[in-house]
């Protein structure tokens, strides 16, 4: 996950620089007004043409990018600290002086984003390349402008708020990664165009990369992004249409066309990448003073049959892949439901402001599965959580795969109508009763639910009943009650493994045949609680 680590550090630095420059004469009026950088000649552009080009690329041998040794040596010196000393002049941003448009600023290449990308502006169906301009960057540290070749190229770009160019809300840099700061203006988890052979023992994960972008400003501050994707096993054309940010969510309509030049054993669609070290669920295993540290605390699923599922994230100490089979899913996402500062006590990185990211399929996705990959970690600098949609079939060479979906970078914690209560906390401790011997082989689980119609019910009614299903274990001491002074309900039960195999658990609350909550899903594992 080296790419993730570098991306995580680098995108933390967002700032402006103060270098001056002018467009060369002879460019059309719209170019002079909307680009603060030199532009190439005009060429016609269409998404259909980009798809055709990606299809053609897949029939050709893959050509890996080559970095000159001198430049490679310089880039290796641009670490996180050095990168912070290189600032882009926001006055040179694309659409900087266009009323209502979202300005676009560029990233400098560095040790975590070594390959360059090409950028183009689209206006009236014509595209002009945004040419690299060394004067767009100010160098304030040990790296000097003379150290960088004049044709070094861009590493990526970020999209600024139209009314506040000191802040950005979207960034593309490294492989096919991109992410939004969401409605609370705090970067967290990321997305990718595609995932290839993630967490497979027999194959190394492949990271295709965006090689070219075409950017088109939309009315109201939105942006349409076209991208060419290329890698050893796959090429592709991607279109991402971004609505302007608001205080609830940032919506992106995505269309992905992929073409395989080699067989792909596991193709991940709409992949999400996040970080989870510990939460209230595994706080006993933490080695940090802060109560919780995570960008996301659970995987949410809305199945094709309408069931809502919540799977708390875990850091078990070993690589674990969980599969959730479905047919035409309504959506899935990695969510950050705990929005209380007191849960994190970190006023430097503000984990409570990290966005949720919900994937809403468009069209027929058929039968497949959401896979959740949890990689062990002992630090917050590592992105160790991956989730994506996939099938159990290998994609042979020469195939075309196409998916459409909608991305919601949001803060609500649950997408769509809150017909059922959501899980807001998953805690555990020693099984048994106070004042009696506590068997070490069991655990007590306490799950808090909130929302939907659940608040209408009182404990004394005797209507709300727990439904608990376990595999390879015995359940004891189960009950549900309303938490005094709140609208929450708490489900509590003990689990004793029988030693036969993995212990999978499902639990929810219902009134008769009516589910009142999400289905909580988790895999029990032994813990040393003393």
Predicted regions and their residues:
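Solvent-exposed N-terminal domain segments of exported/luminal and surface proteins
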Residues: 62-200
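A contiguous, surface-exposed recognition patch within enzymatic or periplasmic domains that forms
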Residues: 81, 182, 265, 269-400, ...
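Extended, loop-rich substrate-binding clefts of extracytoplasmic carbohydrate-active enzymes
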Residues: 192-245, 363-378, 382
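Acidic, contiguous internal or C-terminal segments within carbohydrate-active enzymes
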Residues: 227-275
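Terminal accessory/anchoring regions of large secretory-pathway or extracellular enzymes
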Residues: 34-80, 89, 346-530
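Hydrophobic residues positioned within well-ordered beta-strands of beta-sheet architectures
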Residues: 117, 223-225, 236-240, 252-254, ...
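N-terminal export signals
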Residues: 1-3, 9-31
């Amino acid at each position: 996950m080296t790419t993730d680590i570098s991306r995580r550090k680098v995108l933390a630095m967002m700032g402006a620089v103060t270098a001056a420059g002018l467009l060369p004469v002879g460019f059309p009026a719209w170019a002079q007004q909307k680009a603060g950088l030199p532009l190439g000649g005009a060429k016609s552009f269409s998404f259909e043409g980009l798809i055709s080009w990606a299809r053609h690329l897949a029939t050709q041998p893959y050509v890996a990018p080559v970095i000159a040794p001198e430049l490679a040596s310089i880039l290796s010196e641009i670490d996180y600290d050095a990168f912070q000393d290189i600032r882009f002049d926001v006055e040179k941003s694309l659409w900087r002086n266009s009323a209502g448009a979202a300005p676009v600023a560029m990233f400098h290449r560095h040790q975590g984003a070594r390959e360059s990308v090409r950028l183009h502006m689209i206006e009236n169906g014509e595209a002009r390349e945004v040419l690299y301009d060394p004067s767009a960057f100010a160098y304030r540290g040990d790296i000097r402008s003379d150290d960088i070749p004049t044709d070094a190229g861009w590493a990526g770009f970020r999209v600024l708020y139209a009314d506040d160019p000191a802040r950005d809300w979207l960034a593309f840099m490294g492989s096919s990664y991109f992410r939004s700061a969401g409605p609370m203006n705090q970067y967290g988890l990321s997305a990718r165009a595609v995932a290839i052979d993630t967490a497979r023992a027999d194959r190394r994960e492949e990271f295709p990369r965006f090689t070219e972008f075409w950017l088109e400003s939309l009315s109201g501050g939105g942006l349409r992004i076209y991208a060419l994707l290329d890698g050893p096993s796959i090429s592709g054309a991607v279109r991402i249409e971004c609505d302007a940010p608001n205080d609830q969510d940032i919506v992106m309509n995505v269309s992905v066309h992929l073409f395989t030049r080699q067989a792909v054993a596991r193709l991940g669609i709409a992949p999400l990448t996040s970080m989870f070290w510990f939460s209230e669920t595994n706080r006993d295993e933490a080695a940090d003073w802060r109560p919780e540290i995570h960008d996301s605390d659970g995987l949410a699923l809305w199945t094709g049959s309408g069931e809502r599922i919540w799977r708390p994230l875990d850091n078990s100490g070993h690589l674990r892949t969980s599969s959730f089979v479905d047919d035409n899913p309504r959506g899935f996402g990695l969510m950050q439901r705990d929005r209380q500062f007191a849960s994190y006590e970190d006023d430097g990185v503000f984990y409570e402001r990290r966005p949720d990211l919900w994937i809403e399929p468009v069209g027929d996705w058929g039968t497949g599965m959401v896979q959740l990959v949890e990689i062990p970690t002992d630090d917050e600098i590592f992105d160790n959580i991956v989730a994506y949609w996939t099938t159990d079939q290998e994609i042979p060479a020469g195939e075309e795969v196409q998916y459409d979906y909608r991305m919601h970078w949001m803060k609500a914690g649950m997408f769509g109508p809150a017909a059922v209560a959501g899980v807001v906390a998953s805690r555990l401790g020693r099984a048994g009763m106070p004042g009696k011997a506590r068997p070490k082989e069991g655990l007590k689980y306490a799950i808090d639910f909130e929302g939907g119609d659940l608040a209408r019910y009182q404990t004394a009614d005797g209507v709300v009943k727990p439904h608990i299903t376990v595999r390879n274990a015995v359940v004891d001491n189960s009950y549900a009650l309303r938490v005094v002074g709140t609208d929450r309900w708490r489900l509590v039960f003990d689990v004793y493994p029988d030693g036969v195999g993995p212990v999978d658990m499902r639990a929810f609350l219902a009134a008769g045949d009516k589910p009142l909550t999400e289905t909580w899903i988790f895999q029990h594992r032994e813990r040393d609680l003393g």
